[in-house]
Amino acid sequence: GFIALGLRIPGHGTVPAGLVNMAWETWLAATRLAVREARAQAPGPLPLHLVGFSNGGALAVKYALDALEDKTGTLARPDRLVLISPMIGVTRFARFAGLKAVPALLPAFANAAWLGIMPEFNPFKYNSFPVNGARQSYRLTHAIQQQVRQLATSGELAAFPPALTFQSVMDYTVSTRSIIAD
């Protein structure tokens, strides 16, 4: 059998407002805790598979990259990744998302902290999205891309676990090119 552990990422996957004051490093810390718990329930040498959708896919990749660099053996190395529309790259304009929120420092312009505010009826993704969510998404993807380049240069990327990736041609949130190239 399998032991499956679902992770509720802090500030993500509950209500869009949870992303207003969140940092991607907190998401990664929660990912590490979840993998540690999964390993406690199914200790090695049982295989460890990480499955992630969108932001969860990016966090699975970041965790796997960190595990490659971990010389202490603290981080369990995943045997395989299954990535569903992983957020490996986002639009280059996401880098500047934080600038849009600057007027929100004034109470009269609080809505500037959001890229859009709409009714929430889609169970698979937010319709409303805070600017900080876009900024943290960019920061996470940028960290992944830098780490991939560094590990490729050192030759350590060759030990990256096999990854099965699914990407929708209708997904406008993540970059398909980044999944292939980065």
Describe the role of every protein-language-model region.
Residues 14-47:
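Catalytic nucleophile-loop/oxyanion-hole region of alpha/beta-hydrolase
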Residues 51-60:
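Gly/Ala-rich beta-loop-alpha elbow adjacent to hydrolase catalytic centers
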Residues 81-95:
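Active-site nucleophile loop of the alpha/beta-hydrolase fold
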Residues 2-16:
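Conserved alpha/beta-hydrolase
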Residues 91-121, 154:
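Short, flexible helix-coil linker/hinge segments at the edges of structured domains or between repeats
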Residues 50-52, 84, 166:
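Short beta-strand immediately N-terminal to the catalytic nucleophile in serine-hydrolase-like folds
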